[in-house]
Design a protein with these regions (language model features):
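Alpha-crystallin/small heat shock protein
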Residues: 1-108
Length: 108
């Protein structure tokens, strides 16, 4: 399923972005759900405006569901909708340095 189109980009060493083209959608038309390590972006479609009389209708407002599997060390930083583009910024949490522990040997 290729609708809606999306990109995944690397912003820097610890930040990634999923960008989804959602022209005409508003924030209340979109659900973003994180359950365990599965990120789901979905919509039941935009409410139809009966008063509009299209001569040509090329912008789709249909229902969709996109799922992305995230690694354990990926957290969602924020989601923004601007100019028809939904951006979900992901933050890669780097594991803390493992402390070196010296074990003393006891002579018996």
């Amino acid at each position: 399923n290729t609708y809606p189109p999306y990109n995944i980009s690397k912003i820097d060493d610890s930040t990634y972005r999923i960008s989804i083209a959602l022209a005409g959608f508003e924030t209340n038309d979109i659900d973003i759900i994180l359950e365990k390590d599965i990120l789901t972006i979905k919509s039941s479609g935009k409410k139809k405006n009966i008063s509009e009389n299209f001569l040509y209708k090329g912008i789709a407002f249909r229902a969709f569901e996109k799922k992305f599997q995230l690694a354990d060390n990926i957290k969602i930083k924020e989601a923004t909708l601007k100019n028809g583009l939904l951006n979900i910024d992901l933050l890669k949490i780097l594991p803390k340095e493992v402390k070196k522990e010296i074990i003393n040997i006891i002579e018996k």
